Amino acid sequence: MRKITSFTPPSAASLEQLMKQLGCTSNQMAALAGVKDKNQWRKYTGANPMRSMSATTLFFMAAQLSLSPDEFERVLDHMRNLGADIATEALSLPSE
């Protein structure tokens, strides 16, 4: 197991670069990061960002980008075993 002991969130420019690299819209990035909508995503990427991305949000987004569908489903199954009720839908990114 690991505990994050230090975290500096990515800059707005880094997140904007990732969005361009993936060819995603703000709505797609919001879904990828597990945040409400494009308005929430834009709070992380605006010229004067209103929010810094939390470690948990960044972790969720990185997991979506790094894990295979089976690995991600395994994590969701573990969450369900812990008592969570989770429903998902496929997220299609331009690079897929």
State what each model feature region is.
Residues S68-E96:
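Short, charged recognition helix plus adjacent turn
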Residues Q28-L32:
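Short alpha-helical "recognition helix" segments of helix-turn-helix
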Residues M1-Q21, F59:
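A short, Lys/Arg-rich alpha-helix, primarily the initiator
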Residues A63-L67:
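Short, basic amphipathic alpha-helical segments that act as recognition/interaction helices
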